[in-house]
From Swiss-Prot:
<keyword id="KW-1003">Cell membrane</keyword>
<keyword id="KW-0547">Nucleotide-binding</keyword>
<dbReference type="Pfam" id="PF00071">
    <property type="entry name" value="Ras"/>
</dbReference>
<feature type="lipid moiety-binding region" description="S-geranylgeranyl cysteine">
    <location>
        <position position="197"/>
    </location>
</feature>
<keyword id="KW-0636">Prenylation</keyword>
<keyword id="KW-0449">Lipoprotein</keyword>
<feature type="region of interest" description="Disordered">
    <location>
        <begin position="175"/>
        <end position="197"/>
    </location>
</feature>
<dbReference type="GO" id="GO:0003924">
    <property type="term" value="F:GTPase activity"/>
</dbReference>
<dbReference type="InterPro" id="IPR050227">
    <property type="entry name" value="Rab"/>
</dbReference>
<comment type="similarity">
    <text>Belongs to the small GTPase superfamily. Rab family.</text>
</comment>
<dbReference type="GO" id="GO:0005525">
    <property type="term" value="F:GTP binding"/>
</dbReference>
<feature type="binding site">
    <location>
        <begin position="61"/>
        <end position="65"/>
    </location>
    <ligand>
        <name>GTP</name>
    </ligand>
</feature>
<dbReference type="InterPro" id="IPR001806">
    <property type="entry name" value="Small_GTPase"/>
</dbReference>
<dbReference type="GO" id="GO:0005811">
    <property type="term" value="C:lipid droplet"/>
</dbReference>
<dbReference type="GO" id="GO:0005886">
    <property type="term" value="C:plasma membrane"/>
</dbReference>
<dbReference type="GO" id="GO:0006971">
    <property type="term" value="P:hypotonic response"/>
</dbReference>
<keyword id="KW-0342">GTP-binding</keyword>
Length: 197
């Protein structure tokens, strides 16, 4: 049996939006209440199946580099997709999404797949970022959008599956494939609307 194709995915966004928590929830189904330090772990792997083919998602975290604006073109090298993350309880992190999108344009390959993810949607009473405005922005870019919660797990797997589907469609010639979600044994089609917190 041959090794699976590798999709390199980057997690970017302002510091403390929960990028590492999203990664750990998806890759390990774990969540830590306290801040997670990724300086010792740069990436995690998880295998998924799309249209009967196994793919390895190699998901890279910025490991705190975003605090110092030291993310360089080398971080983006070879990336197939980028999850741009913000915190729904922090308007500034959403405002900075445009800067992150500009950075993707500057450093990533043309046509890299992107997904916009608003994290911490479980904190309804503290929510500041309007869902419809974020959705309109994502629609204007022609990219998937969803709100997720690393704490509860809501839409975390869906966000990474949306990314995998985008990469598959853009780089492998697929078209809205059915995905066997890891751990669920079932399939889902990412073409439908996502539920929000």
């Amino acid at each position: 049996m041959s090794d699976p194709d590798v999709f390199k995915i980057l997690l970017i966004g302002d510091s403390a939006v929960g990028k590492t928590s999203l990664l750990l929830r998806f890759a390990d189904n774990s969540f830590q209440e306290t801040s997670v330090n990724m300086t010792s772990v740069d990436y995690k792997n998880k295998n998924i199946v799309i249209d009967g083919r196994t793919f390895n998602l190699q998901i890279w975290d910025t490991a705190g580099q975003e605090r110092f604006r030291t993310i360089t073109s080398s971080f983006y090298r070879g990336a197939h997709g980028v999850l741009v993350c913000y915190d729904v309880t922090d308007q500034l992190t959403y405002n900075n999404v445009r800067l992150w999108m500009q950075e993707i344009q500057r450093y990533a390959v043309l046509g890299v797949s992107r997904v916009l993810v608003g994290n911490k949607c479980d904190l309804e009473d503290r929510k500041l970022v309007n869902t419809s405005i974020a959705r309109e922005y994502a629609d204007s870019l022609g990219i998937p959008f969803m709100e997720a919660s690393a704490a509860t797990g809501v839409n975390v797997e869906e966000a990474f599956m949306a990314m995998a589907n985008e990469i598959y469609r853009n780089h492998m010639g697929g078209s809205k494939p059915s995905v066997v979600n890891p751990g669920s044994g079932g399939t889902s089609n990412t073409g439908g609307k996502k539920k929000f917190c």
